[in-house]
Amino acid sequence: MGRIKNNNKGLSLVFIDREETEGTMMLYIRNEKETDYKLVEDITRKAFYNMYIPGCVEHYLVHIMRGHEDFIPELDFVLELDGKVIGNIMYTKAELTDEEGSKKEIVTFGPVSVLPEYQRNGYGKMLIEHSLNRAAELGYEAVVIFGSPSNYVSSGFKCCKKYNVCVEKGKYPAAMLVKELKPGVLDGRIWFYSDSPVMSIDEGKAQEFDDSLEKMEKRWMPGQEEFYIMSQSFVE
């Protein structure tokens, strides 16, 4: 069982009792520092390589995101386990527009990354829940993300159609999930979602960036087909 202490600087200190080994793990969630940049990009690369496509682009997105006007540094967190950075989460601003043209600034997160050898231990969920709490403290009222529902419903995300949040042509992607940070804030209207331009990745530049790094083997994985099916699916 973890015991969490928070302060007003966006830092969490978590003590997790080991059940099968001696001692106690100390886990910090803190804002990313400039000295973390290359390490975080490497963590992201290792976490996503061959997950959705042969190779990945998420580490390049991290690389360019920090310099974009929609990046939110206050919601840029890393997770340290016993002094070692093993995961991170980053946020950008996004926008909802209702049928009358009224706009609402919201947030989206991603990538959220954990080193492969530390995955499926709840660390990603810790990053998500810590950052969502901080986003609410900063006054943001809703979060829209794209991802596998099984990874996010336990953190309170629901199908976008339940909140009448759609993309162009009024479609409701199965992978688009919504969480209200202010209950009822999306009630009574149909919303069209737009993410930040930084999310439109130049695949050529992403490949050049990947080629500049230590070589990793690109290969096909069964999960890539699952991702394709989910990304092409819509809720009626």
Predicted regions and their residues:
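Conserved active-site alpha-helix within GNAT-family acetyltransferase domains
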Residues: E137-E141, G147-K171
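Active-site rim helix/loop that mediates acceptor-substrate recognition in acyltransferases
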Residues: E41, F48-L96
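A short beta-loop-alpha structural element at the N-terminal edge
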Residues: L27-V40
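Conserved glycine-rich acetyl-CoA-binding loop
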Residues: K84, S102, L115-M126, L138, ...
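Short, Lys/Arg-enriched N-terminal segments with co-localized hydrophobic residues
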Residues: N7-M25
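Acidic/histidine-enriched, glycine/proline-rich intrinsically disordered or flexible terminal extensions
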Residues: V185-E236
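A conserved beta-turn-beta hairpin within the catalytic core of GNAT-like acetyltransferases
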Residues: A94-T108, Q119
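Conserved acetyl-CoA-binding loop-helix of GNAT-fold acetyltransferases
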Residues: F109, V114, R120-N133, V144-I145
